[in-house]
Amino acid sequence: MKTRLCIVRHGETEENISHIFQGHLPGTLTENGRSQAVTLRKTVDVSVFDAIVSSDLRRATDTVTILLDGKVPRDWVRSALFREKDWGSLTGQVVGKADFDAFPSDVETKEMLYDRAGKALCFLQDKYAGKTVLVVSHGLFLQSFMARIARVPLEQVGSMRRLGNCECRWMEI
């Protein structure tokens, strides 16, 4: 039996607008980001989900809270496994000022992110087999996560289109 996933990237944040490496920062939704979540709520009925699984970072949990609109979910797991790529010592810095030729050694590699996305996929397969699950997370993480679902090899993950803020994509595992 297939597990259906509604995969959503969090709403726009102040850090998105400022082109900041957010990584594991909590992030602050902009008014537009909140509005994006309200708009998504009109097209995604949260009552159809057996569970919600999200990153434990505030920008993701705030997006879920807006989508819920006061409803109490059956099951909501907030997990560090679904966090954005860890930018290490680049976290909080402006993207345009980073030296892409000499990334610090504490930055999570694409291989590490791909591996973590695989663990997240296994978690969902084990815990929610045959269920319908809302997954709310982050752009780069979700790119690797969806690549794992589609069985796209690591070398081709960059060719996967990333989700926009509060964009939803349905996939089955």
Where are these regions (language model features)?
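Generic beta-sheet signal
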Residues: 5, 131-139
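Phosphate-coordination/substrate-recognition cap region in phosphate-metabolizing enzymes
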Residues: 38-104
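Active-site signature of alpha/beta-hydrolase-fold catalytic machinery across serine-
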Residues: 66, 144, 148
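Glycine-rich phosphate-binding loop signature in dinucleotide/nucleotide-binding domains
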Residues: 45-48, 124-131
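Short hydrophobic/aromatic-enriched beta-strand-loop microsegments
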Residues: 28, 72-79, 154-162
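Loop-to-helix element that buttresses phosphate recognition and phosphoryl-transfer chemistry
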Residues: 5-62, 103-118
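Domain-level recognition of soluble alpha/beta enzyme cores
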Residues: 150-173
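Short active-site segment of divalent metal-dependent hydrolases/proteases
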Residues: 13, 141-142
